[in-house]
Amino acid sequence: MKRIILVIWLLLPAVAIAYHLGPGQKQMTMDQANRLLREAEELAALDSWSQVALRYEEALQLLPKEEVLIRQQLRLELAKAQMLSSQLPVAHRALGDLVDELKEEGVGSQTLLQEARSAHANSQYYMTWLMRLEGQPEE
């Protein structure tokens, strides 16, 4: 009995290292992304939208491709932050791409699609005003 306990005790570090180097890496990147999202929320409360957009971009790079719905929600929030940080043309293109992607899938969240359409419509409105302020003729 003592040998079995000793063998288990000696194998425990090997199991821990195997977990850390395997599935633990994914958990660590998810934790890092979560930390960035919390920072973005804190910065949003301070109206520091350019920093919020940077945190969202970093978190988006860390998220795995399999997390489609979370990535789409994050892309929407990134575009909203870009709109508020004077990056309107970039946000408008990103929202257009997101709306097209959500319509093609058809399986995704309808509320997310409605939110993306609403944000895209707002960006279109402000893009129109921006073009008028720059002196471009009406189409």
Residue ranges and their predicted role:
Residues K2-R55:
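N-terminal leader/linker segments that initiate helical-solenoid repeat arrays
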Residues P13-V15, A44-E58, L84-E101, E139:
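Helix-turn-helix repeat elements of alpha-solenoid scaffolds
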Residues G22-K26, Q61-L69, E101-L113:
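Flexible helix-coil transition and linker loops at the boundaries of alpha-helical arrays
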Residues Q25, Q32, Q51, R71, ...:
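Residues that mark the junctions of alpha-helical repeat units in TPR/alpha-solenoid scaffolds
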Residues D31, R38, I70, E77, ...:
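"A position-specific structural signal for the A-helix of alpha-solenoid helical repeats
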Residues L54-M83, G108:
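Short, charge-rich amphipathic alpha-helical segments embedded
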Residues L69, L88-E105, Q124-E139:
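Short coil/linker segments at helix-helix boundaries
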Residues Q73-R75, Q114-E115, E138-E139:
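Short, charged, amphipathic alpha-helical segments
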